Amino acid sequence: MSKAPVVFAIVVVLFFVELNAGGLPKSFLEALKMAKGDKVAESFIYKNRNDCMTNCKLLPTCPRLAPECCPTKTPECPK
């Protein structure tokens, strides 16, 4: 059995993870570090980030979770 497909799949996954992590704001990544691998906390952080993009008044931490959208929307804020 060839190992090439397995190696290719690993490279694709690593590239995808690196691409996504590079696009996230530093303050959001710091919030994830504070969760320290707690899957429930991480899911809340991601959900709150998505919700903050459309409603900055949802949480007092919205400017940290989605700084490209709160308090003012920039062109980088997803529509």
Swiss-Prot record:
Q: Does Secreted show up as a keyword for this record?
A: yes
Q: List the disulfide bonds.
A: none
GO CC, sorted alphabetically, is:
extracellular region
Its Gene Ontology molecular function terms?
Answer: toxin activity
Q: Where in the cell is it found?
A: Secreted
Which keywords does this Swiss-Prot/TrEMBL entry list? Disulfide bond, Secreted, Signal, Toxin
Modification after translation (UniProt): Contains 3 disulfide bonds.
How would you summarize where this protein is expressed among tissues?
A: Expressed by the venom gland.
Q: From which residue to which does the signal peptide run? A: 1-21
Where is this protein chiefly located? secreted
The entry's family comment says:
Belongs to the scoloptoxin-10 family.
Full protein name: U-scoloptoxin(10)-Cw2a
**Native species of this protein?**
Cormocephalus westwoodi
